[in-house]
Amino acid sequence: MPGQKIRIRLKAYDHKLLDESAKKIVEVVKQTNAKVSGPVPLPTERTLYVVLRSPLKHKDSREQFEKRVHKRMIDILEPSPKTIDALMKINLPAGVDVEINL
């Protein structure tokens, strides 16, 4: 498929799991002789939640919770049908969200 590009975006709460998944995808794609660009680390989404510790008073006493979403992007240049088949067969952990754009 000349002139085509596949962009894979990975999201996860655990950065170690995310890096392992990205490494696995890159290895599989390199075995099919396609060119790979990445994994490129994208900015981490950080959401902060502040909650009162006491249900009645003591407004100065608060608890802070944080949620981080780590992201990576992989571009596959000049993919072959063999590359696409290999990508479909990869088993990734349940904590990793995969978004593929052609």
UniProtKB/Swiss-Prot annotation:
GO CC, one annotated term: ribonucleoprotein complex
One Pfam match: Ribosomal_S10
One function term, GO molecular function aspect: structural constituent of ribosome
Xref: InterPro entries: Ribosomal_uS10, Ribosomal_uS10_CS, Ribosomal_uS10_dom, Ribosomal_uS10_dom_sf
Example of a GO biological process term: translation
Keywords annotated in UniProt: Ribonucleoprotein, Ribosomal protein
PANTHER family reported for this sequence: 30S RIBOSOMAL PROTEIN S10 FAMILY MEMBER
Quaternary structure, from the entry: Part of the 30S ribosomal subunit.
Family recorded in the similarity comment: Belongs to the universal ribosomal protein uS10 family.
Name of the molecule in the record: Small ribosomal subunit protein uS10
Organism: Thermosipho melanesiensis (strain DSM 12029 / CIP 104789 / BI429)
Lineage of the species this protein comes from: Bacteria, Thermotogati, Thermotogota, Thermotogae, Thermotogales
Gene name, Swiss-Prot/TrEMBL: rpsJ
